Amino acid sequence: MPHVSRKEYSSLFGPTVGDKIRLGNTELFIEIEKDLRGYGDESVYGGGKSLRDGMGANNNLTRDNGVLDLVITNVTIIDACLGVIKADVGIKDGKISGIGKSGNPNTMDGVTPTMVVGASTDAISGEHLILTAAGIDTHIHLISPQQAYHALSNGVTTFFGGGIGPTDGSNGTTVTAGPWNIRQMLRSFESLPLNVGLLGKGNACGYGPLEEQIIAGAAGLKVHEDWGATASALRYALRIADKMDIQVAVHTDSLNEGGYVEDTIDAFEGRTVHTFHTEGAGGGHAPDIIKVASLMNVLPSSTNPTLPFGINSQAELFDMIMICHNLNPNVPADVAFAESRVRPETIAAENVLQDMGVISMFSSDSQAMGRVGENWLRLIQTANAMKVARGKLPEDAAGNDNFRVLRYVAKITINPAIAQGVSHVIGSIEVGKMADLVLWDPRFFGAKPKMVIKGGMISWSTMGDSNASLPTTQPITYRPMFGAMGKTMNDTCVTFVSQASLEDGVREKAGLDRNVIAVKNCRNVSKQDLVRNNNMPNIDVDPETFAVKVDGVHATCKPVDIAAMNQLYFFG
């Protein structure tokens, strides 16, 4: 049997088991753990390559016989559930139909039965690329529709949040309030190439106002301090959530007016809740909201303004808070409110707790202190900053950072999907799930995706001058592709609602053309279900110094002055 050198093999088919890949200009290195393809029969598209008629492409089977619509060949997969593996990925009917070996079973050994290539199949060459599940951002202030395009440009295809545009309420709270607003926002998203789940206003000490929003199309509720995050409001929201199987997100009481963090924990009554700001710079009980990350029933996330913790974080946060929450810098009480939320000690601890897998999710807080187009970027920057500051994780192998990278990838893919009740549809690269996928050049991993696949079609991509002789002619910019055009979006995008809303006919009542799918299993999940991020240590906060101790050890880090993939990667 002929042999080729590892270097030559890599140039032809990309890396394989034992090969390592550096992510961007970070200190993070992944190593391929498993190869599902089989050597010698690789599927490759191109002149003189194997995916030709009668060779790697079957010339008898039709699409109805199971032939793929699209295959991504020889790609390196980074997925929180699968690990770091090498495989072909097959897509059919907008869903992932196979992960393994693609090709023609008449001429190739070991072809995965659901991954036959034929005349109905197109191909993306993934030999020198990385594939991840698309990002899910669960903390979206719907202030401007243009957020969608910035999110896609950083590999995010799903929004959970609320708002109706640049109202002061939307600027400060992720809430779409009331049935009329909910229906109009669902209709607006018909023209945006993203999945969406809206959060209704959970601040009501009565079941009627909450239930009508859930039936109208809200996929969850948000209890926010700006509308009054009282213990009573939390109890009502959580009780209706238990009844209707939706998630409740909470931004707790920074001023401790209605009670302290212990009172809020008591109000949870052991029920599942998604804590949005598990560190208080974005809001929440001052100074110790971070303690809730140790609880089994709390699904904790935090947002990208403080991740990674940088030398300018403290300075920029004050102005952010003043603007987002309708505060006046000439009013001493408003200034004191803003200052109470910016604590370098707890911000540093937030970074450490993310690295330890204690805070489980990573979101943006779009245009309301956070940057919607930087979620993957900040995620990988934080992972790198923590490796530099804290060294290797105990779970990592000696020669790679696979566990750390997978822990962070889980924070933006499968864990938000689990928390919001959509992991049966999106969140990981698994057979049967919607093909919401992102292809990355390893040199730009986390910073700039090469291509975004939405529901099995390319919806967003780098693209050169459309009047040029090649697709790679500069200037290369992000542009919408055919998957983001016309009626195709009805098939490639999903609107998430409650089961009660689906049964009430929200699709017909709101005049929606897109796929409408119900969230589920929101109430029977716990911290233990979150992938690679389910640690629950004891957390204490010193009320005077704000120092955070995790199992008695001071959790802190220095602010970074130089972040990976920062100015070197972005001009202007």
Curated annotation (Swiss-Prot):
Main location: cytoplasm
Pathway: Nitrogen metabolism; urea degradation; CO(2) and NH(3) from urea (urease route): step 1/1
TM regions (residue ranges): none
Cofactor (UniProt): Ni cation
Cellular-component GO terms for this entry: cytoplasm
Pfam families: Amidohydro_1, Urease_alpha
GO molecular function: nickel cation binding; urease activity
Disulfides per UniProt: none
Protein modification: Carboxylation allows a single lysine to coordinate two nickel ions.
Compartments it resides in: Cytoplasm
N6-carboxylysine PTM sites in chain numbering: 222
Active site positions: 325 (proton donor)
Domain Urease: 134-572
Gene3D superfamilies: Metal-dependent hydrolases, Urease, subunit C, domain 1
Binding-site list for Ni(2+) 2: 222, 251, 277
EC number(s) reported in the record: 3.5.1.5
Positions with a binding annotation for substrate: 224
UniProt keyword Nucleotide-binding, yes or no: no
Cofactor info, note text: Binds 2 nickel ions per subunit.
CDD domains assigned: Urease_alpha
Class of enzymatic activity (EC top level): hydrolase
Binding site for Ni(2+) 1: 139, 141, 222, 365
This protein's UniProt keywords: Cytoplasm, Hydrolase, Metal-binding, Nickel
PROSITE patterns in alphabetical order: UREASE_1 (PS01120), UREASE_2 (PS00145), UREASE_3 (PS51368)
Descriptive protein name: Urease subunit alpha
